[in-house]
């Protein structure tokens, strides 16, 4: 058993769990962490990243099980709040499904590199700053108050997250705030919206990578990454909800900009850790 590889897997799990739901681009950080640590082969690393995202999204399902179950059953029972939330999530998921299936692989082939991630981080940071300095009037305080038109627009904005470094969470949270959704509701809606998007994209990626899974694959490495991702994501979700109740996202804007500049530096110097 390669203990160093297990350690790297745990670090990747922590990176995924912490960054998946923050507006700072989990994909960008995972690409950077993988390259800095020379983590696994390119093919195995890609499968690993998809798998640990499942661990992070499982944390959302665990934390919000009662509300999500209410949304699922609301489609059958007709309970108003649950049904409205379910329809909102479905509508918001459609754009990225259509665009992702049509152009997702093309985007990966062209833009999955350090420079693209850095640019996405910097541009996103500037947009977050602008939104926080010019906050729109809030018209949806809770997730259940988000209108169907707002949900559709959030879904359209989420398509931008196909670009590495943009951040799915960043696009949906800031997009929702721009449309008048409260910071807390925008954050929780982003959590929920990640469930169909990440699971759907993940299953598709795993299916397309079945040849890699059939080779000599170290499943213990995968297990460590998923478990660590789940635990770290669960802790992050609880901390973030408490954070946004009192503070804004300006610190993340600065983080994105500084991180983007550092990634550009690493990209042009070829610096690695191990």
UniProtKB/Swiss-Prot annotation:
Biological process according to GO: cell wall organization; peptidoglycan biosynthetic process; regulation of cell shape; response to antibiotic
Taxonomy, superkingdom: Bacteria
Transmembrane portions of the chain: 4-24, 45-65, 84-104, 111-131, 146-166, 186-206, 217-237, 249-269
GO cellular component, one term: plasma membrane
Further facts: Bacitracin is thought to be involved in the inhibition of peptidoglycan synthesis by sequestering undecaprenyl diphosphate, thereby reducing the pool of lipid carrier available.
Protein task: Catalyzes the dephosphorylation of undecaprenyl diphosphate (UPP). Confers resistance to bacitracin.
Name of this protein: Undecaprenyl-diphosphatase 1
């Amino acid at each position: 058993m390669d203990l160093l590889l297990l350690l790297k897997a745990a670090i990747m799990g922590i990176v995924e769990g912490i960054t998946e739901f923050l507006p700072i681009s989990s994909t960008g950080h995972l690409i950077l962490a993988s390259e800095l640590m020379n983590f696994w082969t390119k093919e195995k690393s890609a499968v690993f990243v998809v798998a640990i995202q499942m661990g992070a999204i499982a944390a959302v399902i665990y934390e919000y099980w009662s509300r999500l179950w209410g949304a699922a059953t609301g489609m059958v029972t007709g309970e108003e709040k649950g049904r409205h939330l379910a329809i909102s999530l479905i509508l918001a998921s459609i754009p990225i499904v259509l665009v992702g299936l049509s152009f997702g692989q093309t985007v990966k082939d062209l833009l999955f590199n350090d420079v693209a991630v850095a640019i996405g981080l910097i541009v996103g940071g500037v947009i977050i700053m602008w939104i926080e300095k010019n906050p729109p009037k809030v018209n949806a305080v809770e997730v259940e108050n988000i209108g169907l038109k707002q949900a559709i627009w959030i879904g359209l904005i989420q398509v931008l997250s196909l670009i590495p470094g943009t951040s799915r969470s960043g696009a949906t949270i800031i997009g929702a705030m721009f449309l008048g959704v409260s910071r807390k509701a925008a954050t929780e809606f982003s959590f929920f919206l990640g469930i169909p998007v990440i699971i759907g994209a993940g299953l598709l990626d795993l299916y397309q990578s079945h040849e890699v899974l059939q080779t000599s694959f170290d499943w213990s490495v995968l297990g460590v990454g998923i478990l660590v991702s789940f635990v770290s994501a669960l802790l992050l979700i609880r901390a973030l909800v408490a954070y946004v109740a009192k503070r804004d996202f300006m610190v993340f804007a600065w983080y994105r900009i500084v991180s983007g500049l550092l990634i550009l530096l690493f990209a042009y110097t070829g610096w690695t850790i191990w």
